[in-house]
Curated annotation (Swiss-Prot):
Keywords: Carbon dioxide fixation, Lyase, Magnesium. Belongs to the PEPCase type 1 family. The gene is ppc. Its EC number is 4.1.1.31. One of its GO terms (cellular component) is cytosol. Forms oxaloacetate, a four-carbon dicarboxylic acid source for the tricarboxylic acid cycle. This is Phosphoenolpyruvate carboxylase. Its cofactor is Mg(2+). It is an enzyme of class 4 (lyase). The lineage of its organism: Bacteria, Pseudomonadati, Pseudomonadota, Gammaproteobacteria, Pasteurellales. It catalyses: oxaloacetate + phosphate = phosphoenolpyruvate + hydrogencarbonate. It comes from Pasteurella multocida (strain Pm70). PANTHER family: PHOSPHOENOLPYRUVATE CARBOXYLASE.
Length: 879
């Protein structure tokens, strides 16, 4: 254990040394000396040296504008390098040699075997396993793609250095390469000059598939197969496809006017182009491998008599894939394709069938070892990615559909749909859905907004079934919200019943979700088209912003539980789609713990979950890390289904109901009820300046003129994370626990902590958040940026935070936060030395900018953006 972490510390030290050499070469020794002085003062300040703290503040307050940028960049880049070293640690040899993770697939299978779980149960559960990760563009993904590539290369160098048989010359060559990469990163602008377009975001998603997931999926399936054989003696079927990927990049138009129907069309084309490109690389490698001559009579009868029968089949696929690339090249360039559509590959079966025939023939001819190599990997990629690379979700806000239908009803003389009662809306929608005549008048010219909604539906109609995975309705509140989308799809010519998914986001909507779905299931037309399958999306971000973490997480749990029970009663196969993020305020928790804390039976039809921006990079950005992440997801789902968590006791539910009510009231009293809260929030955080950072394609606000309620959940959390108060992740939670303890419920709460995964995960995540907060830094923001008349609010919140920390420590019976996870506590302590100067510098920069808002200094603006990205790296999560 000690060796494992000393290796990581050595890597961090080495990378920091190389960064120092780079800075000295680029900026001169004086700047390096200044940076080193700030680092030492920050470290001593953290150790309680008040003199060092004052010297640190004075040094940062007097830095000249031209020196601010290199100083900010130095600390920001060091934190990025620390993240790389930590990410590498999870996949390093030392990690696997010293920590046989109890959360791994093999450890789970060993436990299942020891507990005598029948082989048939394990086989059935493995064959039903489904993990669908939905890649989404992240408004606060702060690392540019050009830097991500360099970070991947640094990771590879760390891996090479771990080999013990390196010669001095080999070691020096790797270290020289590391120095080159760190220098390249230093001389690359870490801040984008302009926001990415949705098309560029989609390219980023496809790059993750190409550089990591393409390799990781077959590798993960080999691990799963090895464990299945070792412990239970069964092989995974070749056609088993437990992993799927979907994407929102190019499909999510909720609040993003830049995602148009044409963008969606082009992203779908680009996905097919990239899939053809990746499969072509595989096919060319297979052509080299499959030089063998022996095949079965059936294979020969189907494909003809050839000296190298498999190569002949593979070469035919190579020609078709080359033609496919040319076809989509032309479409992407808005040219008429030179290749006919019948000459290209448009369906998975065109790849699967000939390659599976090769596989079966090789198996039958005694060449299992060859069949189970690259050919098996390729077959598994066809099952996972297919010729569309990933499926695409479409998402739009519920009012956009209602407004479109209201326009239609007004035009055809039926009145204003928007003013009708819910029962009248449902009656109209069901009547139109059951009718064979079209609803849309031929000569009607809709508004631009409605035209865009209809154009999107028409793009869906152009796609074969399965390319678009579902249509998600954000801010869904009623059954008519779901029926309205079905009607718009029907009227736009979609020839199949696309799954339409309500997204329940606010506290009230989560509580009403069972009633809404029950209404839908009681409609004959609806039951007739859903084929006894239903997906429902649970929103984590907006419910936490609406009600606070504790109330939101309990509402999410209860909604899932109610929906599972309802669907069981109605014989409907329910898939719960979790819209969670990386931060606690957005439902984030370590994947394994988060899944085991779900209600019993909620994962029996698999998992569908969003993976966003920076979390995609941390969890899926490297092949070995992605294999590890997929393993954690798989083991948690299998464990939840084979060794289900306990049903909550009635007493636990009562306590949670009370905690939820109290915490929601406390949270809303501050966020909604405190008259000075919005001006305090805007002054104490860089919320207003964040909008200038070219992070994602989506605007930060639904309504540019609105207050906190109009701010999207992600920037809301991002802003509070910057000033180290991290308010959305804890406000109300600790205070509600304290009140319950004061009422004599401590014994029950301790029992919940020990034996209920849902509750212990919540408390564990609270402890993690508390360990990243800093009351002194938060106070520093207030004193230099906030009107003294509003200081009382910050003082009150910090006092509450201190009390909440003591409350959580009283439950864990520890003196220090994260005592049970000393490695995380050490990681946070290490980062603080580098994050503190960025926070202090950020305050100074905000002060300078706000003093002269009409004529901002470009160097100061640039440095502020760097501190924002640096603090995000230091906190190891953004929004």
């Amino acid at each position: 254990m000690i060796q494992q972490y000393s290796t990581m510390r050595n890597n961090i030290s080495m990378l920091g040394r190389f960064l120092g050499e780079t800075i000295s070469d680029a900026q001169g020794s004086d700047i390096l000396e200044l940076i080193e002085n700030i680092r030492v003062l920050s470290r001593n300040s953290r150790h309680g040296d008040d003199q060092a703290r004052n010297a640190l503040l004075n040094t940062l307050a007097t830095i000249s504008n031209e020196n601010i940028i290199p100083v900010a960049r130095a600390f920001s880049q060091f934190l990025n390098l620390t993240n790389i070293a930590e990410q590498y640690q999870t996949i390093s040899r030392h990690h696997h040699d010293h920590v046989a993770s109890e959360r791994s697939i093999s450890a789970l299978f060993k436990r299942l075997k020891a507990q005598q779980v029948p082989k048939e149960n394990v086989m059935e559960t493995v064959q039903k396993l489904l993990i669908e990760l939905v890649l989404t563009a992240h408004p606060t993904e702060v690392t540019r793609r050009s830097l991500v590539h360099k970070h991947v290369e640094i990771n590879k160098c760390l891996s090479k250095l771990e080999h013990t048989d390196l010669t001095d010359a080999e070691r020096k060559a790797i270290e020289r390469r590391l120095l080159q990469l760190i220098a390249q990163a230093w001389h690359t602008n870490e801040i984008r000059t302009q926001r990415p377009t949705p098309f560029e975001e989609a390219k980023w998603g496809f790059a993750v598939i190409e550089n990591s997931l393409w390799q990781a999926v077959p590798e993960f399936l080999r691990h799963l197969n090895t464990s299945a054989v070792e412990y239970f003696g069964f092989h995974l079927p070749v056609e088993l496809n437990p992993i799927r990927f979907s994407s929102w990049m190019g499909g999510d138009r909720d609040g993003n006017p830049f995602v148009t129907a044409e963008v969606t069309r082009q992203v779908l084309r680009l996905a097919r182009w990239k899939a053809a490109d990746l499969f072509l690389t595989d096919i060319q490698a297979l052509s080299d491998e499959l030089s063998v001559v022996k095949c079965t009579p059936e294979f020969q009868a189907k494909y003809g008599s050839h000296v190298e029968p498999y190569r002949t089949v593979v070469k035919a696929l190579r020609s078709k894939l080359t033609a496919t690339l040319a076809y989509y090249d032309d479409l992407l360039a808005n040219r008429t394709p030179r290749v006919a559509e019948e000459d290209i590959i448009t369906q998975d079966a065109q790849l699967w069938e000939p390659l599976y025939d090769c596989y079966q023939s090789l198996q039958a001819c005694g060449m299992r070892i060859i069949a189970n190599g690259l050919l098996l990997d390729c077959l598994r990629r066809i099952r996972c990615f297919g010729v569309t690379l990933s499926r695409l979700d479409i998402r739009q806000e519920s009012t956009r559909h209602a407004e479109a239908i209201a326009e239609i009803t007004r035009y055809i003389g039926l009145g204003d749909y928007a003013q009708w009662s819910e029962s009248d809306k449902q009656a109209f929608l069901i009547k139109e859905l059951s009718s064979r005549r079209p609803l849309l008048p031929r000569e009607w010219q809709p508004s631009a907004a409605t035209q865009e909604v209809l154009d999107t539906c028409r793009v869906i109609a152009e796609q074969p079934e399965g390319v678009i995975s579902c249509y998600i309705i954000s801010m869904a509140k009623t059954a008519s919200d779901v029926l309205a989308v079905h009607l718009l799809l029907k009227e736009s010519g979609v020839p199949y019943h696309l799954p339409v998914v309500p997204l329940f986001e606010t506290l009230d909507d989560l509580r009403a979700s069972e009633q809404v779905m029950s209404e839908l299931f009681n409609i004959g037309w609806y039951r007739g088209v859903i084929n006894n399958k239903q997906m429902v999306m649970i929103g984590y971000s907006d419910s936490a912003k609406d009600a606070g973490m504790m109330a939101a997480s309990w509402a999410q749990y209860c909604a899932q539980e109610a929906l599972v029970n309802l669907c069981d009663k109605c014989n409907i196969e329910l898939t719960l789609f979790h819209g969670r993020g990386g931060t606690i305020g957005r439902g984030g928790a370590p994947a394994h713990a988060a899944l085991l804390s779900q209600p019993p039976r909620s994962l029996k039809n698999g998992l569908r979950v969003t993976e966003q921006g920076e979390m995609i990079r941390f969890k899926l950005g490297l092949p070995a890390v992605a294999v590890e992440s997929l393993g954690l997801y798989a083991s948690a789902i299998l464990e939840a289904n084979l060794l289900p968590p306990p049903e909550p006791k009635a007493q636990w539910r009562t306590v949670m109901d009370e905690l939820s009510t109290i915490s929601c009231q406390i949270y809303r009293d501050v966020v909604r009820g405190e008259k000075d809260f919005v001006p305090y929030f805007r002054a104490a955080t860089p919320e207003q300046e964040l909008s200038k950072l070219p992070l994602g394609s989506r605007p930060a606000k639904r309504n540019p003129n609105g207050g906190v309620e109009s701010l999207r959940a992600i920037p809301w959390i991002f802003a509070w994370m910057q000033n180290r108060l991290m308010l959305p992740a804890w406000l109300g939670a600790g205070a509600s626990l304290r009140q319950a303890i004061e009422k004599g419920q401590k014994t029950v709460i301790e029992d919940m902590c020990k034996t209920w995964p849902f509750f212990s995960t919540r408390i564990g995540m609270l402890e993690m958040v508390f360990s990243k907060t800093d009351t002194w830094l938060s106070e520093h923001y207030d004193q230099h940026l906030v009107d003294p008349a509003l200081w009382y609010l910050g003082e009150s919140l910090r006092e509450q935070l201190k009390q909440d920390i003591q409350t959580v420590l009283s439950l864990s019976h520890e003196d220090q936060l994260m005592s049970d996870l000393p490695w995380i506590a050490e990681s946070i302590a290490l980062r603080n030395v580098y994050t503190d100067p960025l926070n202090l510098l950020q305050v100074e920069l905000l002060r300078r900018l706000r003093r002269n808002p009409d004529n901002p200094n470009p160097d100061v603006e640039q440095a502020l953006m760097i501190t924002i990205t640096g603090v995000a790296a230091g906190m190891r999560n953004t929004g």
